[in-house]
């Protein structure tokens, strides 16, 4: 990049698009004003300075609005409607102001220089190193964040730390955002993504291309093209990704076809083939582990019936788009269960899985060194509604900790047929699999079930405090035994 300090940590700042009526006054965002100005300065004026002039402008501030003197600053810099202005607070009511055109190039640049740097042919985006493309998915809309290619991030210094940026649509409307990098090497744009998609009418399945405008003092990712999901020609990125994933899974696909045509002679697979389909399917409801843990527990009977414990330390998950994820298969002694690690979170995000969803896998091939499990969206969603009734969210209050009492919903008790468990000791499992006995009582005044003696100790064990919510999963296969709840996650409210 031309400016190596472009992505360095920024001073407190805010940005404003110039709307009709901007010449007489401009507002400082309330949040910024409250945090950096209110109560900290007695002065009634601010000082503005721009890169295009050595002069300093004094502007009156009334509340959080700049008034007298602002018009002179506007006229001196020839600011116009739809231009974009960044205010960087340097302290003591002093601001460095960067005036940008509607395209976010510095307005002080010569028109000829701008024309020489703007790409006009959409075909150039694929080879332009200042561009990157991404697809709109259910999961990235839900998280209000979208990934940034690693090579792009590394090229422009986004692969280290956090960097404040601006997301901008094709019409020049801006949203404040930031680029965040993680130790794993993953880089995302966090914030503003959902709003940009809504404003630009981008839907799930669409692809879009962003161009980095690195002539501005604050990095700008501007939307420069949209590829609708309809039509095969409009999805070159999707095709390329499927082809890349298919290369990894093609050998597994060939093995599946061979098994279907010839049958598998091995004893282990003849045993698994006797099942009617349920034996070859793995269904798990893991709302607590989708985002809070990377591990994914696997039922022991499934793992044993399909022979996955013999010599296999890896499994491969494949979705309906032929993309694969390789996970490490391990055994947890404390819970006496198998689990997988290494790609579960990525798998959930890519396939739009949310807390409370059920996940159904079908064993496609177990005769290879690395077993292959096929994920079905349709089957997973059909099972999701039923299994969500097994999850219970409880909010802990100071009184519930003090009295060691926490009420359960009547609907949850009724749906799961727990009425006869009142007055008995049930078991709560913490995140390490340790058992905590807790009394389940019936409060006759409110005709409701309540967790009693032992609750306080369990809350201390899982580290939940007052005003936090805890998600529990009912682990109860038959009504002849006492109910058991497994701790999933805690939610700060």
From Swiss-Prot:
Bilayer-crossing residues are: none
Provide any one GO MF term from the record.
Answer: DNA binding
Record's CDD domains? B3_DNA
SMART domains tied to this protein: B3 (SM01019)
Protein name as it appears in the record: B3 domain-containing protein REM6
User: Where does this polypeptide localize?
Assistant: Nucleus
Q: Is-annotated flag, keyword Transcription?
A: yes
Coiled coil spans: none
Signal sequence, start to end? none
Q: Which organism is it from?
A: Arabidopsis thaliana
Q: Which UniProt keywords apply?
A: DNA-binding, Nucleus, Repeat, Transcription, Transcription regulation
- Tell me which PANTHER family the record gives: B3 DOMAIN-CONTAINING PROTEIN REM-LIKE 3-RELATED
| DNA-binding segment(s) | 11-103, 131-226, 281-378, 391-490
Q: Look up the record and report any one GO term of the cellular component aspect.
A: nucleus
Keyword Transcription listed? The answer is yes
InterPro entries for this protein? B3_DNA-bd, DNA-bd_pseudobarrel_sf, REM_fam
